[in-house]
Amino acid sequence: IKTQVFKNNLSLSGSIEANEQVEIRSEVSGIVEAISFQEGSFVNKGQVLFKVNDQELKAQLIQATTKEGLAAENARRAKLLLQKEAISQEEYDVARAEHKSTQAQVQLIRAQIAKTSVRAPFSGKIGLRSISPGTYITPTTLVANLVNIGKLTITFSVPEKYASQIKLNTNITFSVSGTTQKYHGVVYAIEPEVATATRTLQVRAIADNKEGKLFPGTFANVELPLDVINDAIIVPTEAIVPIQNGKKVFISEKGMAKEVKVEASTRTD
């Protein structure tokens, strides 16, 4: 019998997910005027993805701007009349409030026009589109999915008996079906409580995917290291004999069997 380094790894099933994912939709309703992305391509944060026709909004802006100009002039005149005590404070306040209201309307329409250019909220890979130029869309219309696959998360559940051994920044290895390649990740988030329904603790790790070999939605076979024993004595399970107060094994000493009481730490498959 001799001591050796023993790594106690826990084998778990996990799910690979995009670090960032969003459904691209328009905040305004209207006819799609132009589409500026290629399906399945990489897009940059802030890049215009598609444009909704804004002619009606621009016409409304011209009308609102004209009203705002008239209201500004009325407010200016009302101020002069107030200084000459030709009108009451209340009449001036009404003119001033009307001016502020028209200013707000102009700002609102400009904000609506800005929303007709739908931009990527972050850099990533955009999926298949469900619209074409000329399609009438509303805020409920799903245009495409945008995912950041440069980094992926691996979510897995750990049985509650191991919960106290899970630490942040723990390095994990994992593999996916169809390949023997090993990938690496780091635990960055741990659920603060054990799920009562499953008696498991949910853990999440993050991994680089710069080469794009991994896909969100796939399963992962996770190897989670629990601890490392530098001077472990490894004994076959069948060599351990249960006794009333614990366990024992038999060793050979000077050609004779000797009974030794042992304390089992970790069992492997």
Place the predicted regions along the sequence by residue.
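N-terminal beta-strand block that forms a small beta-sandwich/beta-barrel module immediately after a flexible targeting
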Residues: 1-29, 188
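Short beta-alpha junctions and helix-cap segments that line functional grooves
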Residues: 140, 234-238, 261-262
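Acidic, gly/proline-rich low-complexity N-terminal segments at the extreme N terminus
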Residues: 1-13, 165-174, 180, 233, ...
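Short, conserved beta-turn/loop elements at beta-strand boundaries and strand-helix junctions
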Residues: 3-6, 21, 191-196, 242-245, ...
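Surface-exposed patches in structured soluble domains
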Residues: 15, 29-36, 42-48, 112, ...
